[in-house]
C-alpha cells in the first residue's frame, strides 16, 4: 500500500498529528506540507490534515481537498474549539463537502493550542468566535493522548 500524508500547520499542532499518522503507517509512505504536496493520484490512501479558519479548513488545505478527485481519504484536524463540539463537527462536514467524489474512510479532530497572536486577534473582534471560550482548555494540545487516539483510530480501521 502506498500512503500520502498531507498537512497544513500554522503553529505546529497539525504537523504533530501528521507525524503521528506517518509513524503509524506501514508500506510505502510519503509526507508533505500541503504547499509541496503532490496530487492524490497514484496513492492508495491519502491522509489530509488541516487547521480551521472561520470554521472551515484553512485555505491551502481547502484548495487541496477540492482537487483530490475520487481518492480514498482520511481527514484530520486541530482546532481551538472543544473536541466533539458543534464547531468542530461543522468544520469536518465543511471539509467533506470539498471532497465530492472522494471515499472518506475516516476522520479525527482534536484541540490544538491556539497561538497568543491568534487569541489576541480573536478577543479584539466585536463578535468573538465561538471557539474562544474553549481555547484555555486547548493549551498543551495535541498531547500524547491525542496522538495515541489518532493512531488507534487508524489502526482500528485496518487501512494500512
Where are these regions (language model features)?
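Structured loop/turn residues at beta-strand edges in well-structured enzyme cores
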Residues: 1, 41, 102
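N-terminal beta1-alpha1 ligand-phosphate binding loop
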Residues: 2-24
Amino acid at each position: 500500500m502506498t500512503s500520502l500524508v498531507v498537512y497544513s500547520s500554522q503553529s505546529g499542532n497539525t504537523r504533530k498529528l501528521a507525524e503521528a499518522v506517518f509513524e503509524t503507517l506501514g508500506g510505502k509512505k510519503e509526507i508533505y506540507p500541503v504547499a509541496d504536496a503532490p496530487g492524490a493520484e497514484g496513492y492508495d490512501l491519502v491522509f489530509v490534515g488541516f487547521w480551521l479558519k472561520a470554521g472551515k479548513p484553512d485555505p491551502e488545505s481547502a484548495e487541496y481537498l477540492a482537487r483530490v478527485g475520487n481518492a480514498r481519504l482520511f481527514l484530520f484536524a486541530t482546532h481551538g474549539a472543544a473536541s466533539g463540539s458543534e464547531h468542530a463537527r461543522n468544520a469536518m462536514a465543511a471539509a467533506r463537502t470539498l471532497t465530492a467524489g472522494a471515499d472518506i474512510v475516516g476522520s479525527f479532530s482534536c484541540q490544538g493550542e491556539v497561538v497568543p497572536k491568534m487569541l489576541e486577534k480573536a478577543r479584539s473582534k466585536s463578535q468573538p468566535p465561538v471557539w474562544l471560550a474553549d481555547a484555555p482548555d486547548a493549551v498543551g494540545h495535541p498531547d500524547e493522548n491525542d496522538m495515541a487516539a489518532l493512531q488507534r483510530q487508524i489502526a482500528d480501521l485496518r487501512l494500512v
